[in-house]
Every structure is written in C-alpha cells, then in structure tokens.
Amino acid sequence: MAVPSEFKYSKEHEWVKIENNVATVGITEYAQNELGDIVFVELPETDDELNEGDTFGSVESVKTVSELYAPISGKIVEVNEELEDSPEFVNESPYEKAWMVKIEISDDSQLEELLSADQYSEMIGE
C-alpha cells in the first residue's frame, strides 16, 4: 500500500502536503481502501476557517459515511470541485487527483504533531 514519504499524515488517515505555507489535504490509500467505492464527497466552502480537529466534510462510500477532519488550523484557500462530479477519483488516485482542500496554515507548529510516512505505515500495520 502506498504511503508517499514526502507527505505528513494524521491519525485520522488524512495526508498533508506542505508547499509555501499551504497544506494540500486528502485521504490516504489505506482510508479509501477501508471505505470501499466512494460515491459522494462533501467539501466545505473556500474561505472557511478551520481549527485543527474540526470536521470539514465527509466521504460517502457504499459501506459507510466517514467524516473528514482538519489536520491543521487555517483558512481554506481552494477546494477540489472535481470530486463533486467524480468522487471515484478518491479510489483511483488518492494522492494526486483526489486532493480535497488546500489550507493556508495559521499555526505551523501543528505540523510537528503530524506523523511521518514511517510512523503512519507503522500505525496501519504496513
């Protein structure tokens, strides 16, 4: 199972890619695998403010609905609107096409609380 080393990870199975104080966030391959076929993705509005741990949307699969949690605090600067029409991207390409939101980071000290790829792999038993 892919756990790209260039990303950070949350214990709630979100991946985080940091570029110039903006965090791109999606769910991991492990998470989409556990959920099964994704049929609907609900995401927030641009400019919404999030605190670490806030719910920012949900992913609905044929099995269940799973909440999405903000791995860091900040303002949403972009939302992947393609997922509204193509939720299957979450299954097909969780680390590329299926990014969910981009968050302008308000407290970069929170990044230290995220897991490395090795720590995340250990957590999921890989």
From Swiss-Prot:
Cofactor(s) annotated in UniProt: (R)-lipoate
GO BP annotations, alphabetical order: glycine decarboxylation via glycine cleavage system
Pfam family, one: GCV_H
GO cellular-component term (any): cytosol
Domain Lipoyl-binding, chain residue ranges per copy: 22-104
Key words of the record: Lipoyl
Bound cofactor: record note: Binds 1 lipoyl cofactor covalently.
CDD domains per UniProt: GCS_H
Matching InterPro entries: 2-oxoA_DH_lipoyl-BS, Biotin_lipoyl, GCV_H, GCV_H/Fam206, GCV_H_sub, Single_hybrid_motif
Residue list for modification N6-lipoyllysine: 63
PANTHER family from the UniProt entry: GLYCINE CLEAVAGE SYSTEM H PROTEIN, GLYCINE CLEAVAGE SYSTEM H PROTEIN-RELATED
Family: Belongs to the GcvH family.
NCBIfam families in the cross-refs: gcvH, PRK01202.1
HAMAP family, sorted: GcvH
Function: The glycine cleavage system catalyzes the degradation of glycine. The H protein shuttles the methylamine group of glycine from the P protein to the T protein. Is also involved in protein lipoylation via its role as an octanoyl/lipoyl carrier protein intermediate.
Subunit and partners: The glycine cleavage system is composed of four proteins: P, T, L and H.
Protein name: Glycine cleavage system H protein
Source species of the chain: Staphylococcus epidermidis (strain ATCC 12228 / FDA PCI 1200)
